[in-house]
């Protein structure tokens, strides 16, 4: 009797033109992440540019970028409908039991990026080859006094403090926002520190009413947004999932979206981003299943969307795409999007 892995190797590549990834037990989150990374040409090219040297990078079976290279090659040129990720997870140092445990996909992404950059730096490729450069933006976190300066009731400038905050992902609230644009605007609304929660200003040696927030200074070539679907309920002391509807636009104009930010950085033009992929979680905070919805990355399929569901890859119907973007008001659009 053939298991899923064995049967996948006997079949031909799917009609979608893409190769799926076999689930080791609970690695759907890893599979979804890998498919979104593979279908990002800029990242794929940097992975392919890596040159393995055993004297520098150690054993081949423990070299993460080499194993990712080989996996990407099978995804791009393989003739079977699905391929395995076991060589890559072995390079991670995972045991068999770790393949049966679902992990945080955002945390895994950050750890993978750091590991890839570490190997690339060992190669002497320079900063231009860093994976994180594709995703790194910069915010300025601030605390600003709400108390007017002496003699000037109109200008609250008694205190203002900024410090840089580089990021690889922007984490956005989804509860009650309705869509990603509103989530971005809410993320950059400053918090007011007053009453019992006043800010102690060391420069002024007293507590003051203040605002604490963040402004965008620069955005990366590839913008990765994290919708904060998981929260902690302090009454039940349990992790819970926020299932509020959050519509996702195909194109988001960051200049228009951030124009309403209270302390938007004047003169910065951020441009627009086209949605390339979504990692979708269905289920509860206790467990569930990840899939990736990906826009075709080739000239012959750029207008099409594909559902990467572990070993199975299929083209999405117009109705499925409409539901994903929030065009069907009767459907609970994107409530599960991670």
Feature names for model-found ranges:
Residues 17-22, 95-97:
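Short, conserved non-catalytic motifs in the polymerase core
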Residues 18, 130-133, 279:
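Catalytic micro-motifs at enzyme active sites that drive phosphoryl/nucleotidyl and oxygen chemistry
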Residues 21-36, 100-111, 287-290:
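Active-site nucleophilic cysteine motif
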Residues 2-5, 39, 43-166, 200-205:
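Papain-like cysteine protease catalytic cores
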Residues 1-16, 37, 50-59, 74-79, ...:
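Exposed substrate/partner-binding surface patches
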């Amino acid at each position: 009797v053939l298991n899923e892995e064995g049967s996948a190797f006997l079949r031909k590549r799917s009609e979608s033109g893409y190769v799926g990834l076999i689930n080791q037990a609970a690695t759907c989150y890893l599979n979804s992440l890998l498919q979104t990374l593979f279908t990002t040409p800029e990242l794929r090219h940097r992975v392919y540019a890596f040159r393995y040297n055993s004297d520098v990078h150690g054993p081949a079976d423990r070299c993460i970028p080499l194993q990712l290279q080989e996996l990407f090659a099978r995804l791009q040129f393989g003739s079977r409908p699905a391929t395995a990720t076991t060589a890559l997870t072995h390079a991670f140092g995972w045991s068999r039991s770790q393949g049966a445990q679902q992990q945080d996909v955002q945390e895994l992404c950050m750890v993978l990026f750091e590991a890839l950059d570490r190997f690339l730096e060992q190669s002497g490729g320079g900063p231009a080859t860093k994976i994180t450069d594709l995703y790194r933006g910069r915010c300025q976190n601030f605390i600003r006094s709400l108390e007017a300066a002496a003699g000037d009731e109109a200008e609250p400038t008694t205190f203002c403090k900024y410090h840089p905050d580089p990021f690889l992902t922007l984490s956005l609230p989804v509860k009650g926002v309705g869509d990603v644009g509103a989530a971005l605007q809410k993320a950059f609304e400053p918090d007011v520190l007053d009453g019992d929660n006043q800010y102690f200003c060391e420069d002024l040696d007293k507590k003051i009413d203040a605002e604490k927030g963040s402004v965008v200074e620069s955005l990366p070539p590839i913008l990765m947004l994290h919708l904060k679907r998981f929260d902690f309920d302090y009454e039940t002391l349990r992790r819970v999932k926020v299932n509020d509807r959050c519509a996702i636009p195909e194109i988001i104009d960051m200049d228009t979206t951030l124009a309403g930010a209270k302390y938007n950085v004047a003169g910065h033009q951020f441009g627009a981003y086209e949605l390339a992929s979504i990692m979708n979680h269905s289920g509860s905070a206790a467990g569930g299943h990840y899939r990736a919805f990906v826009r075709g990355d080739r000239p012959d399929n750029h207008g099409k969307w594909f559902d990467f569901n572990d070993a199975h890859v299929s083209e999405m119907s117009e109705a499925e795409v409409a539901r994903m973007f929030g065009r069907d008001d009767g459907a609970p659009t994107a409530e599960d999007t991670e």
